[in-house]
Amino acid sequence: MKVLLAAGGTAGHINPAIAIAKQFAEKEHAEIQFIGTKRGMETELVTREGFPISYIEVAGFKRKLTPENFKIAWQAFRGVRQAGKIIREFRPDLVVGCGGYVSGPAVFCAHLQNIPTLIHEQNVIPGLTTKILSKFVDKVAISFEDTNQYIAKKKTVLTGNPIRETIVKVSAAEQKTHEHPSVLVVGGSLGAKVINDTMAELVKDMETDVEIVWATGKREYEDVKKRTQPLPEQVKLVPYIYDMDKAIADADVVIARAGAITVSEICAAGKASVLIPSPNVTHNHQEYNARALEKKGAAKVICERELTPRYLKETLLELLMNRETLQTMSRNAKKMGIVGAAQQIYEIGMRLAGKSSSE
């Protein structure tokens, strides 16, 4: 069996695709091929997992009418031709789109070649690419029930977000490797300047018995490193965390954006969190994600307009100093966790491809 996956841009699109690819590779010994762009994190994350990847030229249109959109339109045309060539040569039994602009050309070309198609939408409110593709793909795997408001229900299957299986598998015995309270700070795979700026001030007078692992994002790392030297001994600064399963398991509290995959992994691991949703996203979907956890008593939410080093520190210490509240939030997060999404998407894909699964 051959499966082609299209995903690009940030880890939030790429990691779910990798989780799905592993299901097909492990259960069917399927031959896997990725399509991406050379500008996104797929150049690193996909190859790190040992999967082959081919690249096409594609970019997203600007919201305002600008001359640059003509260049992007030409790139899109070239991207469709490039994706079509890759698909004809690879001859997949199934094509799966997991988000990012690269999904459009790949899934569209597969449809034109009568190859079964499936897309996965990570957020409550689908992006433009998903809305367009949903008109002709065979199935749309969704992560939230509310997404049915935007896509024809006959096309959708509620699966949740595919997350790294190791997030769930880490046992309670493996979780605590530190004596003091531990905080994980992640601003997304590319980084979040506002979170980094706030943390740069916060760590200057943070209590010495609180251990902090702070992932700045690759494009922010060097700047943050220069601004915060010398760092307190209990603060570990890194550009990116590859073993996120271990990092989340080892934390008492996670400070993060509220992207769909981040939220899904926090819930699956059963961790209390302080969520700082990005306002710079379509339909403000991150705040929607964050508020869903807040309503269930699983997270504290701080919007950017409210964020200050003092407010974040007070919120954090309030949680760390109250173990009962921390444990309650952890239990509530765990209840919200949906696991088995990659397995379910694998089963849907097998049915679309007209094949029986090995399980």
Please state what every model-predicted region is:
Residues V3-A7, A30-Q75, E220, R305:
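Conserved nucleotide-sugar phosphate-binding/catalytic loop shared by glycosyltransferases and other
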Residues Q82-V95, S103-L118, K131-K135:
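Glycosyltransferases and closely related glycan-assembly transferases
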Residues G40, L45, A172-V254, Q286-R291, ...:
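Donor-nucleotide binding loops and adjacent catalytic segments primarily
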Residues T325-V339:
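A short, well-ordered alpha-helix in the C-terminal region of glycosyltransferases
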